[in-house]
Amino acid sequence: MKGTVNYELRGDIAVLEVDNPPVNPLSSGVRVGLCDQFDKANNDENVRGIVLKGAGNAFIAGADISEFGQKMEGPDLHTALKNIEYSEKPVVAAINGPALGGGLETALCCNYRIATEKSIVGLPEVNLGLLPGAGGTQRLPRIVGPSQALKIMLSGVPVPAKKALDQGILDSISTGDLVEDAISFLHKKLDETTEHPKVRDLNEKLVEARGNENVMAEAKALASKSRKGQFAPGQIIKCVEAAIEEDDFDAGMKKESDLFLECLLHPQREAMIHIFFGERTAGKILDVPKDTETQKIGSAGVVGSGTMGGGIAMNFANAGIPVIVLDQDEKNLERGIGVIEKNYQMMVDRGRLSQEMKDGVMSLITPSLNYEDLGDCDIVVEAVYENLELKQEIFKKLDDVVKGDAILASNTSGLDIDAISSVTERPEKVVGTHFFSPANIMRLLEIVRGENTSKETLATIMKLGKIIKKAAVMSLNAPGFIGNRMLFGYTQQANMLLLEGALPNQVDTALESFGMNMGPFRMMDLVGLDLGWRARKLAKLETPLTNKIADALCEQERFGQKNGKGFYNYSDGSRAPNPAPENEEIYVKVAEDNGFTRRDISDEEIVDRCILGLVNEGAKILEEGVAQRSSDMDIVYINGYGFPIWRGGPMFYANSIGLDKVLEKINKFAEKDQDFWKPADLLVALANNGGKFADAPTDDLKKEKLAFKQEVKY
C-alpha cells in the first residue's frame, strides 16, 4: 500500500505526518495510517491534542487519481476522515503548502486550521469532471456560505492563505515554525475551552440561504458561462442545494456520495483526467533524458511590442523574470508598453491584482529602442509578423549582439525554424516558441524543435514553459506544426460545407453545440477575411476553391468584425454576430460557378466532417512523428483552439467513438472527395486491429514528415 502516517510526540501533543511523496495523496497506506495513528493518539492519556501535517512541501494533495477504478485496499476515505472528525481530542491541521481537493476536505474535518503564508487551499475536482466527494460540498458552505463555496468549487481555482483566512477557511496564519505555531495555537484553545467546533455542526450560513433563490441562480449562470457543456458543475450545485435544504448533515453527505458516483461513471471524467495526465506527459521529450542540464533563465528580451510581443513580455514579468521589450519604432514602443500597463490596470480594477503587485510586475518590464540592450539576456523571443526574410534579418542582429550562450526563440505560427536558425552561428540555441494570442491569457505554447536544436535548449524551454504557466507541447519543424496543420482540415471542411449548401450560422451552431468554443465562421470574422485575400492579390495567386466565398465577400468589402460585416453582420461596438441573409446570393453564385448543387446538410454531417477532418490530419501528424503522442495533440486543441475539455481532445474523442467507426465515416466521405478524405495509413492500421491512437506511433507505421517545400493539398 502506498504512503504512511508518521507519529511523533511533542510534549502533550501528538504530531501526525502524512508521508506519501511528492504531494501526499490520500493513498491506501495513508488512509490506514490515519485510522491507526488517530486511534493511538486518542488512546494515549498523556496526549491532549493532535496536529496533522504533511511531509515535505505539501499538506495533502487529495485523492490518489491512480487508484480510481482499482480494487479498494484498506479503509475508504470517508472512514479515515470520520476518525479525524470524531477524534476525542482536538485536531489542528497544519497546512504547509497546497491543501487541494481531499487535502482541504481532510482539513475541514479538523477542529482548526492553520497555514503558512504561501499555502493555498481549494477544491479543484471540477477540473477532473468530478465533485468534491469527501464532504467538501457539505462542509465548505458551512464555513464560507453557499454562494462563496459554489464560486470556489465551480472555478476550481485555489485560494491563497490570506484570502482563506478572511473567508474563515483558516483560523490562523503561521509566520514562524508551522508545527510549533500549531502546537501553541492548540494549547491556547485547550486552555480556553473544552468545546471544540466541528464544521459539520455549523448551520447558521445554510439557514440564512434558505429561500434565497439568487444563490442557486448565480451559481447556475456561472456554470453555464465558464463550464459550458460540463456535467460535474450541475452536480456540485445540487449538492450545495441539499446542504441548504437538509437539516441532517448525513443526508447531505449521502446526496454528495450518490452524485459523486454519477460523476465518476460519466464519460466526461475519463476525458478530463486524460487531459490532466496528458499535460504532465507532454512535458517529457522522449529522447531528452530527465537529468538533462538546463540553463538558468534570469532575464529575457522580446523583439516586437505589438499585441503578441506585449503578451509574451507579461508572461515573463508575471513569473518574476525581468524582460526588455525592444521596438525600433518609438511610437509603437510607447503604445505597446501602454497596452501592457492597461492590461494590468484592468486586473487591478477587477480585484485580481493589487496595485502593489501591478507596480512590481511593471518594474520588471523595460522598454528599449536598441538591440545592444539585449546583450545580457538569457533568452530573446522574436515576436514580429510572419515574414521569413524579416525574421532572418532580426536573428542575424540578435546573433551579433546577444551573448553566445543565450537562447534565441522565434514566435512563429508556421515558418521554417531551420531556415531562421541557418542565419545564426548558434543553430543549437534556436527554437520555435509559438505563443497563442492573447499570449498573456492563452495557455498553449507550441515548442518547435529545429533540426539542430540541442537537448539542453529543449529541456530549458520546456522548463520555462512551466515557469510561465503554459501548457507546453513539442512539435517537430514541419508546415503548420501541430495545431495549424490540423486546423487546415477543419476550416477546409467548413468552407466546403458552405459551398455544398450549409449556412455559416448552421455550421457554427452545430460545432458550438458539440462544444467548440467558437464556430469556424465566427472565428474567421474575428481574425479578418481580408488577410488571406490581400496576400493572394499581392502575390497574384489564384484563389483556392475553399477560399472563393471568403474572397467574394471581401470583393464586397465584407472583411469581418473589423468593419462590421463579414459572414455575419455586427452592430456598432458589438462583437455579437447577426445573420447576413444578403450573403446567400453570393454563396449560391460561387457554388454554381464551381459546379456545386447546394443541398440540405444535417448538423451530424457538419460535426463529423469538421471534427474527423481534424482527426485524420492528426493521424498523419502522428505517423510522421511531428507530434510525439496523440495526447499532445489533444492538449494543443483544448488549450489553443477551443476544443471542449470534457471531450478529451480530438484524438481522445476519436478513440471514444471507436476508430473503426471513424474509418467507416471517412471512407463514406471519400466516395465524394477522395483527395481530402484519403485515410491516414496509421488510422487504417489501428482501426483494423482494434487499436487506439495511444498505441501509436510504432516504428513500422512511421512515415517521413512533411517538408516545408511540400504543400498540404486538399
Please identify what each model-predicted range represents:
Residues K2-G3, D19, K71-P75, K82, ...:
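N-terminal glycine-rich phosphate-binding loop for ADP-containing cofactors
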Residues V5, V47, I60, K296-I297:
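A broad structural signal for short, well-ordered beta-strand segments within beta-sheet-rich domains
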Residues G11-D19, G29-K71, K82-N96, T116-I120:
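A structural preference for short, pocket-lining loop segments at secondary-structure junctions
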Residues G103-T106, C110-Y112:
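Active-site-proximal alpha-helical scaffold in enzymes
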Residues L123:
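Small cofactor-carrier domains centered on a conserved lysine used for covalent cofactor attachment
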